[in-house]
């Protein structure tokens, strides 16, 4: 998918809280919005190059969103709104093999006490609930989720087990917001409960999927399935 708004580069200075950061644009320091509540400490390093998206919304305090950052030569998209859009585009274009037969695609649908990112349906009425998690944490080709504890994420995984137990299809797709990685695994040291829930979900028949992305400064799209170790 193309990022149609104005894109520009900046130097990262600091991130005083989850939602705000300071960057340098043409020698001027500017506060920007960070659309990601994760830590992103391996990406948002003082002096590193980041990518901004200009919003031009008079009702906002900040003019720009910080949507990506360079880790060496590797560009990592950190916009938490992007994964659902990328996966929706991939579903519409039949790029996810095990989900190609689900032609009715609905977004943000509730089941039980959770709202899942997608409710998919085949022509014969079979239903499948899909949850999407964006992944930005990488170390030597190994990607992990989460990069901060996530009770909400664990709740989603347990609800997917309930979906499966009720005879419907269920899956979680980890969208790795970078390219050229080797493997995905849950980040047990960061959130043991999430890792245990994911392992249980796999045992109960929930599909666990991971895909990397082709990431450029002004575009991002689904790329290839990635090996998973749980």
UniProtKB/Swiss-Prot annotation:
GO molecular function: DNA binding
Intrachain S-S bonds: none
Cross-referenced CDD domains: SfsA-like_bacterial
Lineage: superkingdom: Bacteria
Matches recorded under NCBIfam families: sfsA (TIGR00230)
Family: Belongs to the SfsA family.
Protein name: Sugar fermentation stimulation protein homolog
Organism taxonomic ancestry: Bacteria, Bacillati, Bacillota, Clostridia, Eubacteriales
């Amino acid at each position: 998918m193309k990022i149609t708004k104005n894109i520009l580069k900046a130097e990262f200075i600091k991130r005083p809280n989850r939602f705000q950061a300071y960057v340098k644009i043409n020698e001027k320091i500017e506060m920007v919005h960070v659309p990601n509540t994760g830590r992103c400490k391996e990406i948002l390093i003082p002096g590193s190059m980041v990518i901004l998206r200009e919003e031009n919304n008079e009702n906002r305090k900040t003019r720009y969103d910080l949507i990506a950052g360079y880790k060496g030569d590797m560009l990592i998209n950190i916009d938490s709104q992007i994964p659902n859009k990328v996966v929706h585009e991939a579903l519409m274009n039949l790029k996810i093999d095990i989900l190609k037969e689900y032609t009715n695609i609905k977004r943000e649908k509730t089941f039980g006490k959770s709202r899942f990112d997608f409710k998919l349906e085949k022509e014969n009425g079979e239903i499948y609930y899909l949850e999407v998690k964006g992944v930005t944490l990488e170390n030597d080709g190994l990607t992990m989720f989460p990069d901060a504890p996530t009770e909400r994420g664990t709740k989603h995984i347990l609800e997917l087990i309930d979906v499966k137990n009720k005879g419907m299809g269920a899956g979680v797709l980890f969208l790795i917001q970078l390219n050229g990685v080797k493997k995905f695994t849950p980040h047990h040291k960061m959130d043991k409960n999430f890792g245990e829930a994911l392992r249980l979900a796999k045992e109960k028949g929930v599909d666990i999927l991971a895909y990397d992305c082709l990431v450029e400064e002004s575009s991002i799209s689904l790329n290839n399935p990635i090996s998973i170790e749980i």
